[in-house]
Swiss-Prot record:
Domain of life of the native organism: Archaea
Keyword tRNA processing: yes
SMART domains: Fibrillarin (SM01206)
Family label: Belongs to the methyltransferase superfamily. Fibrillarin family.
Protein name: Fibrillarin-like rRNA/tRNA 2'-O-methyltransferase
Species this protein is from: Methanothermobacter thermautotrophicus (strain ATCC 29096 / DSM 1053 / JCM 10044 / NBRC 100330 / Delta H) (Methanobacterium thermoautotrophicum)
Listed SUPFAM superfamilies: S-adenosyl-L-methionine-dependent methyltransferases (SSF53335)
A GO BP annotation: tRNA processing
Length: 224
């Protein structure tokens, strides 16, 4: 018989039969057509690793950080809000600042945020953090999922602006967005080197296969 259990070291993240789950704050409401599970008097949303790189990273063993109910998260590249909605489930008394540059994606994101008071959608360019400096609190986690060649640079700049001294940064490095002609392994090594040379310590890193090809999740913290 299957049971819902909390993932070790991951507050607010649960697992049942190899499926990740988060508690649904709006019972009966789906965000992206995800499955719903009722267990022990609670409703859970299935966190699809093929729709969310963070779910893929956790299933592949990423550890070393945990969000609390009152955590502040800066999400760079929130898109339509799939992953951000699950983070919202976890940080129930916190805040998820969702940076998205595409007006089309922002329209979808706004629909998700309407029923989630802890999500703040911002139509901004993640490569220009000073433009939203006064709108975002200091963050416990800066999460980056953008398909740009300079993704590591903008990730570092946002951490320099917003990351708390004891906070964490998590980037989903997309090798093919940086250079389609070169080995992903070499690209990952170079991007990790950029993070280290900018004063960040690597806490963990995992590939996202089989859910995402040529992607790596890299978790960092200030090297102080």
């Amino acid at each position: 018989m299957y049971a819902v259990k909390e993932v070790k070291g991951m507050d607010g993240v649960f697992i049942m039969n190899n499926s990740l789950l988060t508690i649904n704050p709006n019972p009966g409401v789906k965000v992206y057509g995800e499955r719903i599970i009722d267990w022990g008097g609670r409703e859970y949303r299935v966190w699809d690793p093929r729709r969310s790189k963070l779910a893929a990273a956790i299933l592949n063993g990423l550890r070393g950080f945990s969000l609390n109910s009152d955590s502040r998260v800066l999400y760079l590249g929130a898109s339509a809000g799939t992953t951000a909605s699950h983070i919202s489930d976890i940080v129930t008394d916190g805040r998820v600042y969702c940076i998205e540059f595409s007006p089309r994606m922002m329209r979808e994101l706004l629909g998700v945020c309407e029923s989630r008071k802890n999500m703040a959608p911002l139509l901004e360019d993640a490569s220009r953090p000073l433009s939203y400096l006064r709108m975002v609190e200091a963050a416990d986690l800066v999460y980056c999922d953008v398909a740009q060649p300079d993704q590591t640079r903008l990730f570092i700049e946002n951490m320099d602006c917003f990351l708390k001294r004891d906070g964490y940064g998590l980037i989903m490095i997309k090798a093919r967005s940086i250079d389609v002609t070169r080995s992903p392994r070499k690209i990952f090594r170079e991007e990790v080197g950029k993070l280290e040379s900018s004063g960040f310590r690597i806490i963990d890193q995992v590939g996202l296969n089989p859910y995402e090809k040529d992607h790596m999740a890299v978790l960092v913290k200030r090297d102080v």
